[in-house]
């Protein structure tokens, strides 16, 4: 007669301990992996504002600069053409375009231009504009005094708005031989959707955006 193999109590306890240790190791490994992934995601989010700050501070990658006033030296005789480009990222139902596609200005001349934005949705939507200039070597010389890109924009259903940009090209660009022969600068904006917009009350008289601009 054949006999089925039997397992002693000690062997059974040892087997259960082995299974328990295996499960414990799996849980530990899963926890470590989850922690590493969370750390990497957090680091990637932290890198975005740092990268934006670095670009604004240095003009890297064609990022323009922020100025508080007109240049002390005033405009110079050299002229340059400035083209205006507009884009809207997927997921934001806006129509966005410059009122002028190109203008000619003196270097150092403070100039105001307008972009027109229309919310084509039947709901309130919000967006934030990213920007750069081309060629990339001009980023540190393109100075903005006022720009809709500085803040998040919230639009009511069907709302149409004119958004100003006040800028100048720093006269010191004339001393940069890397930009000798430069005749045209392209200023480009892309509006991206904001999922959780900050609700701000509309100030009295804010409707006329052309008042009070340089």
Swiss-Prot record:
Residue spans, topological domain Cytoplasmic? 1-26
Q: Which residues cross the membrane?
A: 27-51
SUPFAM superfamilies, A to Z: Ctag/Cox11
Q: Which residues lie on this side of the membrane: Periplasmic?
A: 52-214
Example of a GO biological process term: respiratory chain complex IV assembly
Which InterPro entries does the entry mention?
A: CtaG/Cox11_dom_sf (IPR023471), Cyt_c_oxidase_assmbl_CtaG (IPR007533)
**Taking the first listed entry, what is the main subcellular location of this protein, grouped into a coarse class?**
membrane
Q: Does the keyword DNA damage apply?
A: no
- Alphabetic keyword roster: Cell inner membrane, Cell membrane, Copper, Membrane, Signal-anchor, Transmembrane, Transmembrane helix
Tell me the function of this protein. Exerts its effect at some terminal stage of cytochrome c oxidase synthesis, probably by being involved in the insertion of the copper B into subunit I.
- Report the protein name in the record: Cytochrome c oxidase assembly protein CtaG
